[in-house]
Amino acid sequence: MVQLLSAFVSLLSVVAVSGAAIPAPAPEAVVDVAPETATIEPTGNFTAQACMYICGSVCYSSSAISAALNKGYSYYEDGATAGSSSYPHRYNNYEGFDFPTAKPWYEFPILSSGRVYTGGSPGADRVIFDSHGNLDMLITHNGASGNNFVACN
């Protein structure tokens, strides 16, 4: 034990005399992406965007919502629909949500995959917008009874 202590003291004196610094280990980066969306870009950079809405367990960033809203409103303005679907179509608000804009309202799918809806299966989640393209709310079939909707958080 005395030899070990002596060796340690000798090592400390060598470091002190030489002026060499012993670097502290770099702290590990802790990245908590919930409730955020996270992507690794082709450049290798990590990006995260905060959730604007959460539908069930799906986080939607403002950029994902804007993409769905803009596409839905574009179809609406053109009098067109996504593929052979009926979207966007009028949303009647049978659930009685309190929207910030006046009716008529329209619904358009927002996909959990991050892609913009162009037809096919619409999934459970929707952006609701007015006839001027203003976002009102995100709603989902997840957690609702029958074919009803509940508000996303």
UniProtKB/Swiss-Prot annotation:
Positions of disulphide bridges: C51-C59, C55-C152
Keyword flag Ligase: no
Residues of the propeptide: 21-49
CDD domains named among the record's database cross-references: fungal_RNase
Documented EC number(s): 4.6.1.24
Pfam families xrefs: Ribonuclease (PF00545)
InterPro entries reported in the protein's UniProt record: N1-like (IPR000026), Ribonuclease/ribotoxin (IPR016191), Ribonuclease_N1/T1 (IPR051386), RNase_U2 (IPR048269)
Residues annotated as catalytic: H89, E107 (proton acceptor), H141 (proton donor)
Signal sequence range: 1-20
Highest taxon listed in the record's lineage: Eukaryota
Catalytic activity from the UniProt record: [RNA] containing guanosine + H2O = an [RNA fragment]-3'-guanosine-3'-phosphate + a 5'-hydroxy-ribonucleotide-3'-[RNA fragment]
Gene Ontology MF: a single term: lyase activity
UniProt keywords, alphabetically: Disulfide bond, Endonuclease, Hydrolase, Lyase, Nuclease, Signal
Top class in the EC scheme: lyase
Record flagged with keyword Ribonucleoprotein: no
Family listed: Belongs to the ribonuclease N1/T1 family.
Protein's recorded name: Guanyl-specific ribonuclease N1
Native organism: Neurospora crassa (strain ATCC 24698 / 74-OR23-1A / CBS 708.71 / DSM 1257 / FGSC 987)
Lineage: Eukaryota, Fungi, Dikarya, Ascomycota, Pezizomycotina
